[in-house]
């Protein structure tokens, strides 16, 4: 068995290991802006999967599922790697803010580089900082992603699974369809 290490920012996890930590986004007056995550490196080779919740601050089912999964998933029983991010939009969660965040009012749903604009010549918008860091450190390392939503407070969401077809890579599109079907 090789000793391949999975690295996400300064978190390093050897094969068969699991480690919790934070993605550092930026500094703010109240302290560092960070996003919690768990990195799991299975014993065997395989693809990398990102599972995230909390793109909206008042969606609780996705983060709850992520927290349970990061506790229960045993790296000794899986192949490949899993990056679990229970709460992407921590600023919205801290304030129970629906649809975006309370700082720049941008919605992160599916909007990762290059869709979220930097925001002029001054410091970049916080949503841009979150999106670029999450993309660079997690999404760009993965072949697959489960983005868990549960509906904001005022929404009545029917149960279902959606997946995206790129129209560019037929194998990836078919793999995404199979993943969505297996997920339910």
What would you call each of these model-derived segments?
Residues 1-184:
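Structured catalytic-domain cores with a bias toward divalent-metal coordination
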């Amino acid at each position: 068995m090789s000793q391949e290490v999975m690295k996400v920012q300064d978190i390093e996890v050897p094969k068969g290991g699991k480690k919790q930590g934070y993605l550092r986004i930026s500094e703010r007056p109240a302290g560092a802006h960070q996003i919690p995550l768990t990195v799991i490196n299975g014993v065997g080779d395989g693809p990398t999967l990102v599972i995230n919740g909390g793109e909206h601050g008042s969606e609780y089912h996705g983060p709850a599922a992520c927290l349970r999964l990061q506790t229960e998933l045993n790296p000794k029983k899986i192949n490949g790697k899993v990056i679990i991010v229970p709460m992407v939009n921590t600023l919205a969660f801290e304030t129970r803010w629906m649809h975006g965040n309370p700082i720049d009012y941008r919605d992160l749903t599916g909007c990762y580089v290059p869709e979220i604009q930097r925001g002029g010549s001054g410091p970049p918008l916080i949503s841009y900082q979150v999106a670029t860091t999450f993309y660079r450190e997690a999404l760009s390392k993965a072949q697959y992603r489960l983005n868990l939503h549960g509906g904001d407070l005022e929404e009545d969401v029917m149960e279902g699974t959606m997946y995206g077809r790129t129209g560019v890579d037929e194998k990836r599109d078919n793999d995404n369809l199979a993943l969505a079907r297996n997920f339910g």
